[in-house]
């Protein structure tokens, strides 16, 4: 996974990832965000066979708090040990760049907001220094995400919000054009410093579909026009990957994704947002890979203090279904938020040091599909969703009910070798028939 052209210091030890059979396995969509890539966290990510590791350790405000000439950068504020550990383990690290120093803010006091026009040159210098430092050995960062959910107006969040808050609700394109101006300053130095690096636009929140707003939506879903604003201002030449975020909700015992009224006309939270982004790109003659840089199943507000067994089981269902769907939709990756325990509505895959069922489901999925390639979507079972995956010695079907509640009895195809539940426990069909509601793996002869 480490770049072949990188040349470490001859006096230093180069840690390469374990490579089986003298060639690396094909990339998968599996990923997660971590707030601290500690030794234990890295081990958990390795066990889950993650490919992507997203990490928000870069704060321009912390690195360059004071404007000086020449610039003074405080790299000691960056968790370099964590970045090195992630590289040593072979992960593709997505490094999130955010937080604007006081002296560079377009809106005074708003750390999460846009950069002032007269500070873009300093930002460009910072990007060059950043990429020059963290793209070579021993960090090998190749994916740089600029901002986090920038399609939010600063009036809607605290000034130091984790949201990107580049939004402008008075603008036709909600501020996307000005974000494109920033990309024009960031992209050239990034590519000059590391030609094989990729610039990712900050993961878009995409609150709802502007072409089909749900009833009572006061904004008319205008924030989702942010992406079009980027393209309308010729921003397509200044980024490599589109990123978006999506959070399904556990509601009254079921998974609210496909039926979410904000995106149901396009197929739900995941499929709908992907469909929307691809349509907007098509309208502008653009074709870029898409990354789901945050995703999770959230508990409902009243169930968040102590999540029940039903929520935890549904979350495990969603881990499998959303990764299968991301793979089937051709996404670059699917990054779960977060690997460790999260204060955000029980989204994390651990409770302190104890793995949730969702983590166990991810571990089995990664093991079952190791070295797999995508086959075709499975559509013959009305009411179920599924995909076929190809491996050297077998085919694997994954089937599930989209709401996690409404199941269906199916007749199995010929050539079935084994059937497993989402955790890898064997299931026994009865007279070649099987009840499917939760994610189910069906192994078939090649």
What is the role of each PLM region?
Residues 53, 86, 130, 144, ...:
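Conserved, mostly hydrophobic/aromatic
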Residues 427-446:
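C-terminal beta-strand-rich structural cap/linker in extracellular carbohydrate-active enzymes
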Residues 295-366, 377-382:
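Aromatic/acidic polysaccharide-binding cleft in carbohydrate-active enzymes
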Residues 380-415, 422-423:
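Carbohydrate-binding surface patches
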Residues 17:
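Conserved functional hotspot residues at active sites or interaction interfaces
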Residues 23-146, 150-174, 204-206, 218, ...:
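N-terminal substrate-binding region of glycoside hydrolase catalytic domains
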Residues 174-319, 329:
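Noncatalytic carbohydrate-binding groove/subsite architecture in carbohydrate-active enzymes
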